[in-house]
Amino acid sequence: MDLELTGKRAVITGASKGIGLGCAVGLAREGCHVQLAARNKETLRDAEAFVLNVAPNIDVVTHSVDLSLSEDQKRLVNAAGEVDIWINNAGAIPAGDITTIDERLWREAWDLKVFGYINLCREVYADMEARGTGVIINVIGAAAVRPQPSYIAGAVGNSGLVGLTTALGSRSVQKGVRVVAINPGLIVTDRMGHILRQEALDRFDDEDRWE
């Protein structure tokens, strides 16, 4: 399938593994030059090698950043330059109900995913609007539309991000920019496996019953 993306420039956050790496590989196969952002330099190097093995003729750039920090968010945007596609995917909201997730955990999780998405959308959208072109994709999660009490911080945060995406996207098309959300269902990434094991431990006192 040719999606007519050859030569386009894309940034993917949370790109060293899981859904983010899958997005990077898919775009690279379509001829996109990709920039991968994540915290861990070692896993970023592995991701870069993996993408280049799949698509050796595209450019791959890596950025080691902590996207829970506003200064790193701005540093990434400045380093990335003009891009055609921006995928917000970085986030690690812990499982737990209202009694087990304290304020510190809420804030730490939301600094990365909720405020990370908000701040990056604001920075990236302004540039895309000025150029009259671009796509922002927010990878959010099914908890936004199927909230569960055992994942309350994610349910609330994801619902807010759907609101952000819907509100921004409703006017962005008039400026030549598309802002859309993807709410993936259950995909057993490393992080989701950890969440499922924690839920199994809470419910059955046996983390091996997560499957």
Question: What do the PLM-derived regions correspond to, one by one?
Answer:
Residues 9, 16-18:
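Conserved glycine-rich cofactor-binding loop
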Residues 27, 162, 172-187:
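Conserved Rossmann-fold SDR core element
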Residues 30-46:
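Conserved glycine-rich Rossmann-like NAD(P)H-binding loop of the short-chain dehydrogenase/reductase
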Residues 84, 92, 99-118, 133, ...:
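Catalytic Tyr-X3-Lys loop
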Residues 101, 147-155, 167, 195:
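Active-site loop-to-helix junction immediately N-terminal to the catalytic Tyr of the SDR YXXXK motif
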Residues 121-122, 166:
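A short, exposed helix-loop element centered on a Lys and neighboring polar residues
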Residues 126, 170-171:
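Alpha-helical segment proximal to the catalytic Tyr-Lys
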Residues 145, 184-194, 198, 203:
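Short, flexible catalytic-loop segment of classical short-chain dehydrogenase/reductase
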